[in-house]
Amino acid sequence: MSSQFPSSPYRTVDPYSPPNYKQQPNCPSSNYEKAGKTASESIGNFGKGDYPTPFPSSSIGRVSSPVRSNKVDAIPSSPAFPGQLAETSPKFSSKLSSPSRHTRVINAELDPSKISTITVGRNSSQCDVALCKNKFISRVHASITYLPQTNEVKIHCFSMNGLIVTYRKQFDCYQLKDTMNNNNRAYRLVPRFSNEKCVKEIQDEGGFINFTLEEGDTVYMTYYKGIMLDFRQVLLRISLKEKNSSSEPLRFEKKAEFESESETKHMGSIRKHPLIFTDTSMDRPKKILKDSNKISIGSDSGVAERMLNHFLNSKSSPLSSVSSVDHEEQTLRQDSLSSDKNPMTMKKPKLNKRVLPSKPKKSVKENLDELSRRNIDVMHLQHILTNHLAFANVQQTPLFQLQQVNSQISELSRDELRSILSDAKCVGVIYRHGKDAAGKPLDEEYFYDLENDDDYERRNLVSSLKGGRTGLRSCRRTHKQYFWKKPAK
């Protein structure tokens, strides 16, 4: 590598500086040597003061960008700036622990009138206050209890991730005293100048004081307005509910009761006035629809007579009598109006649909006789079907599979095939109920019965081939339909 691009980050030779005549052997004068020494010393000092160790991504050669010395976050990796590193490190640490970095703050309110407890965590169904979905937050992370007798807050941590309790510095509580409470790790926050021994570390950072709670830890501290719980990326602010909010529903209930009483009094005064009957039949426009006017006039006159008789003969309170009469009048008028709007229509009687007579099913003997008249060897087909059931890989075969044994059997109907199988002594049947996945009824299944087979050669051959699994178990000879059920979590 040439001298113009050195490997060291410090500049040794500048192409724009005056030449060093000390390196030239033909230099006759000593003044030039002194000038070369002073120039090289000034160049070396200038490079050491203004060119720090660059970052790995910087380019080699002459540094063209300005030195970043005023930024707090840029911490150089060279020991050339020890003073600057010592100044920037406290600022950087305070910035990391500041609560302003958290993006979300959740309020948790406690009832000051009684001992109230809320649970905090990730699961909304198990906790009163649900935090965000975060891997550092457990399903039930902590519980917060307010004790109104002593104005204290009890914080208990359930999670192995722990939490950080943050409060303001002006509260003057800097020590945690150990309290033996049922052999659990319980602490109490005490003032700074207390004689108690401090058992847990408390960090003093600027205007806030922090201490951590691990899994199973409990702390008792006096309630202040600025207590916050840090769950990493989420802050929980603890506060008390306002006492005025509980008195507002009572005030609204009293107001509603007063309004209801005034309304009932007003309605009673209205009902005490005498009844005045007016004839309003002339004001209404009349519709001419067959003989509906006669019905409406008769109903109106009957209503008036009934109302007068009921009012004169009743001994009960006028309020109840008037309400019952009004109800009767209303129902009768609705009936008359409905008869006016809906003229009578003749309904056609429902005609019973003609049911086609179904063909009666033939018996087994009739089916076999019909097959013999068609020159079909029933005994041969029985022998083929029995051999298929006896030497099949499965012990039970449905009917639709037996129809596909050969071409001659496939031409038979299902009833004819059932008749052939039912006539064989060594063939058993399992009747099934229900439907398959396509909604079609399930076919019956047939199996080979070794004990009832008269062909001894076939019995010996089947037992020698299949061994002990020749017969069908009795529990499998009845149909059992299984349904899929979603497994429990």
Curated annotation (Swiss-Prot):
A GO CC term assigned to this protein in UniProt: Rpd3L-Expanded complex
One GO-annotated biological process of the protein: DNA damage response
Coiled-coil stretches noted in the UniProt entry, renumbered to this chain: none
Positions of post-translational Phosphoserine modification: S40, S100
Comp. bias intervals (Polar residues): 1-10, 20-32, 56-68, 333-342
GO molecular function: chromatin binding
Record field: compositional bias (Low complexity): 89-100
Record region (Disordered): 1-101, 316-366
InterPro entries: FHA_dom, SMAD_FHA_dom_sf
Induction cue: Regulated in a cell cycle-dependent manner, peaking in G1 phase. Appears exclusively during the G1 and S phases (at protein level). Negatively regulated by transcription factor SBF (SWI4-SWI6 cell-cycle box binding factor).
Location within or outside the cell: Nucleus
PROSITE patterns listed in its UniProt record: FHA_DOMAIN
Functional note: Binds to the promoters of genes with functions important for the G1/S (start) transition; primarily genes involved in pheromone response, polarized growth and transcription.
CDD domains according to UniProt: FHA_PLM2-like
Protein name: Protein TOS4
Pfam families cross-referenced by the UniProt entry: FHA
